[in-house]
């Protein structure tokens, strides 16, 4: 406990410009460093992730708006088709003597083609939404993976020293020598 209070007291007294050294007191340095690093990560990481998600949300909303506009166009086409249907029905009354079944077939074909068009537009809207969502998810995953990889590389680089590096190389050379003896 005395070391902790001494470290906080010593924060007010900076060493002179000529001295440099390592503080080996773990209790005095790590909580401060960790809190600073975590604070920086949370502060900057939250903003980046929030901006990325906001951008994706705007793109998805724009896609939905475009799909709604297409839907509005389809509804307009449906109204035109209904108008044509009414016209066809009027003509059907006039030409009933000439053949009612042919007009009925045309009416059904017109209705079916209109419903197919609406179905296609709805499917296109749903596919577009799913595609945009998947693309947003993939980009978020990629950014998170890149950040995690950078953090892991930073941790590895900070933990590696020359002695550990030489031991790892020696162990790998030994394993390769053993594998060569086995294959010979």
Curated annotation (Swiss-Prot):
One of its GO terms (cellular component) is proton-transporting ATP synthase complex. It is found in: Plastid, Chloroplast thylakoid membrane. The chain crosses the membrane at residues 27-49. InterPro entries: ATP_synth_b/b'su_bac/chlpt. Coiled coil: none annotated. Keywords: ATP synthesis, ATP-binding, CF(0), Chloroplast, Hydrogen ion transport, Ion transport, Membrane, Nucleotide-binding, Plastid, Thylakoid, Transmembrane, Transmembrane helix, Transport. Pfam families: ATP-synt_B (PF00430). It is a single-pass membrane protein. One of its GO terms (molecular function) is proton-transporting ATP synthase activity, rotational mechanism. Signal peptide: none annotated. F(1)F(0) ATP synthase produces ATP from ADP in the presence of a proton or sodium gradient. F-type ATPases consist of two structural domains, F(1) containing the extramembraneous catalytic core and F(0) containing the membrane proton channel, linked together by a central stalk and a peripheral stalk. During catalysis, ATP synthesis in the catalytic domain of F(1) is coupled via a rotary mechanism of the central stalk subunits to proton translocation. Belongs to the ATPase B chain family. In plastids the F-type ATPase is also known as CF(1)CF(0). F-type ATPases have 2 components, F(1) - the catalytic core - and F(0) - the membrane proton channel. F(1) has five subunits: alpha(3), beta(3), gamma(1), delta(1), epsilon(1). F(0) has four main subunits: a(1), b(1), b'(1) and c(10-14). The alpha and beta chains form an alternating ring which encloses part of the gamma chain. F(1) is attached to F(0) by a central stalk formed by the gamma and epsilon chains, while a peripheral stalk is formed by the delta, b and b' chains. This is ATP synthase subunit b, chloroplastic. It comes from Solanum tuberosum (Potato).
């Amino acid at each position: 406990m005395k070391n902790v209070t001494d470290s906080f007291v010593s924060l007010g007294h900076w060493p002179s410009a000529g001295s440099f050294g390592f503080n080996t007191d773990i209790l005095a340095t790590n909580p401060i460093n960790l809190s600073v690093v975590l604070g920086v990560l949370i502060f900057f990481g939250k903003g980046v992730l929030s901006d990325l998600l906001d951008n994706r949300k705007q793109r998805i909303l724009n896609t939905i708006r475009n799909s709604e506009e297409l839907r509005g166009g389809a509804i307009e086409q449906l109204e035109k088709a209904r108008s044509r249907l009414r016209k066809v029905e009027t003509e059907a009354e006039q030409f009933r003597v000439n053949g009612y079944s042919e007009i009925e077939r045309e009416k059904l074909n017109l209705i079916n083609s209109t419903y197919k068009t609406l179905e296609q537009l709805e499917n296109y809207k749903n596919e577009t939404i799913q595609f945009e969502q998947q693309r947003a998810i993939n980009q978020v995953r990629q950014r998170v993976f890149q950040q995690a990889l950078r953090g892991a590389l930073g941790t590895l680089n900070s933990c590696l020293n020359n002695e550990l590096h030489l031991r790892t190389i020696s162990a790998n050379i030994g394993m390769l020598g053993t594998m060569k003896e086995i294959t010979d």
